[in-house]
Amino acid sequence: RSHCTHCKKQISLINLIPLIGFIKQRGKCKNCDEPISLMYPFNELLHLVVGIHVIYFFGISLMSIIIYTIFFVLYVLFILDLKHFYLPIGLNIFLGVLGITTNSIFDVFINDIDILNLGSASLSILGYSAGFLSLWTVNFIYRLITKKDGIGGGDFILFAGLGSIAGPLALAPILFLGSLSALLIVITNLKKYSNEVPLGSGLILGFIFYVLLKYFELLVNIVVI
């Protein structure tokens, strides 16, 4: 069961309740008074807010479960890459499978795109393939010149997964927004990211910004995406 990372004492069930446990303990372990990281209540609050908004827009439905699952997977990948420069292949592949399956069954994420009269399922597969090959090609050219990799393999599969969800036409704006986001992440901690960039975390932020801009029609009079 969960325990305090400082004194190793087990946490009571009532104190494991999201947000309530943190408030009840006043932000400290009840056994050793070690401050509890603010990341815990932040994570809990973030997922609560996202869950409420998903249900508000899509109701209590299978679609809500799928959308929240996509968010949860992206959140885990974001944190892992940000802290450890690690993007598990299993989660990345699951994201791609989820994107292709959802677009094939529900026709929801990329139903406004018309390329050669392709259906959502075909566009999802095309987005997956284009996402993978685009970053793979960039890294291949970089490797020919420098004799070393410039982009991690996990980033290829992650970008492919994002393409399977949003479609091939979304890849360019996601990459642009993701690159800017990755740059901002590096600027916030130059010491940690001096030799390696969490591109995956940046791409995930770029995807989220893209979704907000497109589906909530932000900047609709300025850009068309």
Language model segments and positions:
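A membrane-topology feature that recognizes alpha-helical transmembrane segments
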Residues: 1-225
